[in-house]
Amino acid sequence: MFVMRCDFVSIFPEYFDVLDISLIGKARRNGLLDLRVHNLREYSEAGRVDSSPYGGGPGMVMSAEPWARAIEHIATGESLVVFPSPSGQPYSHDLAQSLSSEMHIVFCCGRYEGIDNRIYEWTATRLRSSGISIGDYVLNGGEIAALVILEGFVRFIPGVLGNPESLVEESYQYNLLEYPVYTKPAVWRGLEVPDILLSGNHDLIREWRYKKQLEITQKTRPDLYSTHIYETDS
């Protein structure tokens, strides 16, 4: 049975207590995921992991040596080392699907003004490594980004989702956003469920949902809409 291993290195390991809940926690208990958390300070001298930046500037920069020690201890030749970073490649549906086939991912969650750039050069000469961005904004650290990346790709691991068909109509599956969904009651505070969803005609329902996907995507993500139209016409 395929068991993916993910290691998270951080100076705030408490961030990852959430790995015991929801689908990820269930997958962990069922033996589908092997998740391990490491405190970066354990790989440093006297717990010191940062220093002032060369050239001046605000804040502190994380030293390369503790990260190198952690990576040497945790990673193997099969590992992919991921640095969550605003300067990394954008996270996407396709990238999430690709990550789900990895045997071992090591997430290096930086803080402060970032990590000494030499750690990226050093890692790239020894292991497969990648910077990944979850959006055009800056967070206080890489922990939340690492969790977002994890949430995105574990859905593709067989057995994690209760209903595998959920992936078939997933938002972004065909460069389209998700259609609106409804549940009981049929009338809520004067607002009604669209009649077509109550018709039982699955062909019409499928057509309606696709139309709504097109409308929503064109309105809020015209870039995805253009890609979908191009791929459909190709």
Swiss-Prot record:
S-adenosyl-L-methionine binds at residues 110, 134-139. The keyword tRNA processing applies. Homodimer. This is tRNA (guanine-N(1)-)-methyltransferase. It holds the Pfam family tRNA_m1G_MT. Specifically methylates guanosine-37 in various tRNAs. It is found in: Cytoplasm. Its EC number is 2.1.1.228. GO terms for molecular function: tRNA (guanine(37)-N1)-methyltransferase activity. The keyword tRNA processing applies. It catalyses: guanosine(37) in tRNA + S-adenosyl-L-methionine = N(1)-methylguanosine(37) in tRNA + S-adenosyl-L-homocysteine + H(+). The lineage of its organism: Bacteria, Bacillati, Actinomycetota, Actinomycetes, Micrococcales. It comes from the Bacteria. One of its GO terms (biological process) is tRNA N1-guanine methylation. Belongs to the RNA methyltransferase TrmD family. GO terms for cellular component: cytosol. It comes from Tropheryma whipplei (strain TW08/27) (Whipple's bacillus). HAMAP family: TrmD.
